Amino acid sequence: MSEAKKLLAQGLWKNNSALVQLLGLCPLLAVSSTATNALGLGLATTLVLVCTNTAVSALRRWVPSEIRIPIYVMIIASVVSTVQMLINAYAFGLYQSLGIFIPLIVTNCIVIGRAEAYAAKNPVGLSALDGFAMGMGATCALFVLGALREILGNGTLFDGADMLLGSWATVLRIDILHLDTPFLLAMLPPGAFIGLGLLLAGKYVIDEKMKARKANTRVNVPQLQDGDAEKAL
């Protein structure tokens, strides 16, 4: 398997930042009340990861190891500030909905962790791909959790998509469950913890089934007895 495929597999599934490393739980649980909010924060985090990894990798030869962490934080803060201004300019409704969690990307362990563990030691192209894979893995987990909570809580999917994609995206709103009253548990923080636990359990079950399938497909080569070996010769 090539290095690029390994990075994609690690970021999207095997070493998923949300479902394996359990990093960034604060925004994961707080913002995932709707699919739109989850998708918006996930894409913003992905953009920050790609830009940060690219910058750290490009500058890695000129950054003294003694002060590398403050420099990484400055790079991350600069990228996050740029992304925050872009969201404020082009998706103001989403900017208001996400609130403080956009600037809090600076303190997200995923970003500083990938900058230190991978980008500082590898070429620019692979570092950018690593940031993309890790960001998309977190985005997928955020989106699935947000979609589940929105469906169970409000009976809808992609409510408020126009905040992220523009006025045309109002057609994406789907009424799945017709609820007389919203299911508040799904929309509150306890529902987020329960939903995350279900996602973790689901990933574990899938991983175990994949391991069992690989074990069943192994070809057992029979050992030749001495007499059989002589006949073969």
From Swiss-Prot:
One of its GO terms (cellular component) is plasma membrane. Its main location: membrane. Its EC number is 7.-.-.-. GO terms for biological process: electron transport chain. It is found in: Cell inner membrane. It is a multi-pass membrane protein. The chain crosses the membrane at residues 18-38, 39-59, 69-89, 92-112, 128-148, 182-202. It holds the Pfam family Rnf-Nqr. PANTHER family: ELECTRON TRANSPORT COMPLEX PROTEIN RNFE, ION-TRANSLOCATING OXIDOREDUCTASE COMPLEX SUBUNIT E. The complex is composed of six subunits: RnfA, RnfB, RnfC, RnfD, RnfE and RnfG. NCBIfam families: PRK12405.1, rnfE. Part of a membrane-bound complex that couples electron transfer with translocation of ions across the membrane. Belongs to the NqrDE/RnfAE family. This is Ion-translocating oxidoreductase complex subunit E. It comes from Yersinia pseudotuberculosis serotype IB (strain PB1/+).
